[in-house]
């Protein structure tokens, strides 16, 4: 269960760690596209006629009511669920199954409970065949980037829900994916921790070069995180909107942003 505040190590400031660690070289973000695609299962079609182009390196947020097909869309982009009709491509080539180039991050942290945070982050590095010393160094660097430098030897149950999600993000990015697919990863967190994770996500992901598709039911989260926001409803992709920038929590009365928020809520029937 998530806790409402982050666990602190005595006498140390967790927040300074990301700035002290040099970022790894960025990857080349991938282009993901759906072409007139029907998504779901033969006995339960979730979305029909989806045309969507996710540009390399962008953050696309996907918002819609519960049961509208958001998770189905994400699993299709991950290669876990083939389209029922139409096509799906990665960089113009057919996408035919799961790949280490596309990392999934879920609401439940999915960390292995018997492994320390560092050992969890080392998993994709071990799959890549890196030597033990290199795995340890890279895992510690990623944990530092997400503010967990003081918690590398902790087991998942000894840290807060927000910290477990930070570790899950570090594990996903340690594998150097070209796309990160996120299924409501902050949905179980309290409001303060959630806002901190959103800020951290933008900061860390912008340094990776990866393409991001982020599913949420929260319109404000979608507008804060996304370069564009895709709207789902009534079994289809209803619209894709550009999000005005700069990204700033302090700006509440920007006319373009206010109009977009109103448009999104109207489109979703809220």
Q: Where are each of the predicted segments found?
A:
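The feature captures the beta-strand-to-loop junction immediately N-terminal to the Walker
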Residues: 63-65
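Helix-to-loop junction immediately C-terminal to a conserved catalytic motif
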Residues: 78
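Conserved ABC transporter NBD signature motif
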Residues: 86-98, 138
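Short coil-to-helix segment of the ABC ATPase nucleotide-binding domain corresponding to the Q-loop/switch region
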Residues: 115-123
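Conserved ABC ATPase "signature" region
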Residues: 126, 133-151, 203
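Conserved signature/switch motifs of ABC ATPase nucleotide-binding domains
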Residues: 154-157, 175
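Hydrophobic anchor residue at the start of the ABC signature
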Residues: 169
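Catalytic Walker B motif of ABC-type/P-loop ATPase nucleotide-binding domains
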Residues: 180-183
């Amino acid at each position: 269960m998530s806790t409402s505040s982050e666990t602190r190590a005595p006498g140390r400031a967790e927040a300074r760690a990301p700035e002290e660690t040099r970022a790894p070289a960025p990857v080349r973000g991938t282009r993901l596209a759906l072409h007139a695609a029907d998504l779901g299962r033969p006995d339960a079609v979730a979305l029909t006629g989806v045309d969507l182009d996710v540009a390399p390196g962008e953050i696309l947020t996907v918002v819609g009511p519960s049961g509208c097909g958001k998770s189905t869309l994400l699993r299709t982009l991950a290669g876990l669920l083939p389209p029922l009709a139409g096509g799906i491509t990665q960089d113009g080539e057919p996408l035919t199954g799961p790949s280490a180039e596309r990392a999934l991050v879920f609401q439940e942290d999915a960390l292995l409970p018997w492994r320390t945070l560092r050992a969890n982050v080392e998993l994709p590095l071990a799959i890549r065949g890196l030597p033990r010393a290199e795995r340890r160094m890279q895992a510690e660097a990623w944990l530092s980037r997400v503010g967990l430098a003081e918690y590398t030897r902790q087991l998942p149950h000894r840290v807060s829900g927000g910290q477990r999600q930070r570790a899950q993000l570090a594990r996903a990015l340690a594998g150097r994916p070209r796309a990160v697919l996120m299924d409501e990863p902050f949905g179980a967190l309290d409001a303060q921790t959630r806002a901190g994770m959103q800020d951290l996500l933008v900061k860390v992901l912008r340094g990776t070069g990866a393409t991001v598709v982020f599913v949420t039911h929260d319109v404000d989260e979608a507008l804060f995180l996304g370069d564009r926001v895709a709207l789902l409803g009534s079994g289809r992709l209803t619209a894709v909107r550009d999000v005005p920038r700069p990204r700033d929590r302090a700006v509440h009365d920007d006319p373009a942003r206010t109009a977009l928020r109103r448009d999104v809520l109207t489109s979703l029937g809220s």
